[in-house]
Amino acid sequence: HLQRRRQRQMCIRDRITSCVISLLANSCGFEFNLPSIDEEIRINEVIAEKSWEKLFNDKVGFISNNISNPELIFPGSFNPLHEGHIKMKELAEKKTGMHTTFEICARNADKPPLTFYEIKRTIDQFQNDESWMLTSAGRFSEKAEMFPNSVFIIGADTLMRVFDEKFYDSHKNMMEHIQRFNDHNINFLVFGRKVNNNFISLKNINVPDIIVDRCTGIDESLFRDDISSTEIRMTNN
């Protein structure tokens, strides 16, 4: 019985491998037929737009569906975009009087780059009146250089990582990156987040003195949404 199960598992692996090889070959212009299997195979094909290719080839720093310079920027993966994101956007716009641009980073320092399928799936979530941009700026200090005089919508958990030395070469290096927020006139609207079953807001974060005046917290009474995109993905799966 154990031997038969192993053989069945090997057969399944071989078929999956053949499917992957076939798709890779076809994407490179070669013919390689899919194996004959009982299951229905659905293939979603995404052809990269020329602007996406330019971004990944470092020909441009960002691409956007809006010709105006972004002022209020909401970085995130938006996988998926949910009601909490929309509420944050609305509150930030009311607070600043600015129009939000959602920012999706195609290449984060601590994550694999987004696939073209993931890029299309993310962009397709936004409504026609919503602005978005795809960037190559993984660090907030890089975003600051790319979009000076901007306000960033940020969760308290993300802001904690911005001030965490382990993401830098040294304390001096961290402070050099943080100084760029002053150099490029960057401000932050900080929304509270649930971290390890505790609600963390701006007042719980040790913000360096040199930019403490650039951070404005949104009170928990105005916004609290403990649902995360990760939890939504787990529920959907």
Cite the ranges covered by each PLM segment.
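Single conserved hydrophobic/aromatic residue that forms the stacking wall/gate
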Residues: H1-D14
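Short, hydrophobic/glycine-enriched beta-strand segments
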Residues: P70-G76
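Active-site cores that bind ATP or allylic diphosphates and position pyrophosphate for catalysis
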Residues: P35, R42-I43, E49, N69, ...
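Phosphate/dinucleotide-binding and metal-coordinating scaffold of catalytic cores
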Residues: F102
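Non-catalytic propeptide/linker segments at domain boundaries
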Residues: C28-I67
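Ampiphathic alpha-helical segments that act as solvent-exposed interaction surfaces
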Residues: R13-N33
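Histidine-anchored nucleotide/phosphate-binding helix
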Residues: L81-T96
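Amphipathic alpha-helical segments that form well-ordered structural scaffolds
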Residues: C19, L23, M88-L91, Q125, ...
